[in-house]
């Protein structure tokens, strides 16, 4: 549905911090599905951990947050023009059930819980091979840049 070049239109993130490879499904105001292919060539694996590479949990959270930004902007049918962006405001009930490693395809699903005055609440999950590896509730706030 959205390839990486199209994702650039909704997120300010670029290498090495763009953590969404493709959006596969979008339901306006409701949900978004996307994925990221984890590869050993990514810079975080030089230190986390060279002999046992594991995707840092905070990067999985960030990837889910990037998905929420795409969902919010697309729901409003707005492409950011540099005057506002969505900031991660809170993460609650975060759980990591299994580590993500190089070779995994992280499958994200973010669902809108509510939106009031530019503050969005989402339920977020990450799965690998259909098995849940991470979940959280997230608040994102639209702010002027």
UniProtKB/Swiss-Prot annotation:
Gene3D superfamilies: Hotdog Thioesterase. The active site is at 48. Its main location: cytoplasm. It comes from Hydrogenovibrio crunogenus (strain DSM 25203 / XCL-2). Keywords: Cytoplasm, Lipid A biosynthesis, Lipid biosynthesis, Lipid metabolism, Lyase. Its EC number is 4.2.1.59. The lineage of its organism: Bacteria, Pseudomonadati, Pseudomonadota, Gammaproteobacteria, Thiotrichales. It catalyses: a (3R)-hydroxyacyl-[ACP] = a (2E)-enoyl-[ACP] + H2O. InterPro entries: FabA_FabZ, FabZ, HotDog_dom_sf. This is 3-hydroxyacyl-[acyl-carrier-protein] dehydratase FabZ. Coiled coil: none annotated. The keyword Lipid metabolism applies. Belongs to the thioester dehydratase family. FabZ subfamily. The keyword Lipid biosynthesis applies. The gene is fabZ. It holds the Pfam family FabA. It comes from the Bacteria.
